[in-house]
Amino acid sequence: MKKILIIEDDPFLSEMYAAKFIENGFEVEVSSDGKSGLAKIEDFRPDLVLLDIVLPKMDGFEMLKKVKEKEELKEIPVVLLTNLGQKNEVEKGIALGAEEYIIKAHFTPTAVVAKVNEILNKI
């Protein structure tokens, strides 16, 4: 069973995405801020992380940078899932090592699951 960590501060969205991934056979953990999300990555060792950018305690960009700096975590693919869609934000996310940059408004939860499966099948 593939493991996914969803780091999202909006409880409605995190529950919605979690339910969709569970329905598709994933083991899911959820975190609501960047700091606890980083700790959860280390403990849970997910196959992929879905990461919001606007988060309390540590934003998604800072967290992504910390994940990619850690030897034991840097191979875990991180997908940014956010409403921030400016070109400079997308470029920053990719430059920091994000596998993919998904703008929430452009993707249904089903499409997000399909994209995650596509990424995991490439690895």
Question: What role is predicted for each listed range?
Answer:
Residues 52, 82:
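Active-site residues of response regulator receiver
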Residues 8:
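Conserved acidic carboxylate
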Residues 15-23:
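Charged docking surfaces used in two-component/phosphorelay signaling
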Residues 31-32, 55-58, 67, 76:
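Hydrophobic residue at a beta-alpha junction
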Residues 14, 56, 65, 74, ...:
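The feature encodes the CheY-like receiver
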Residues 25-32, 40:
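Short hydrophobic/Thr-rich beta-strand motif most characteristic of the beta2 strand and flanking loop
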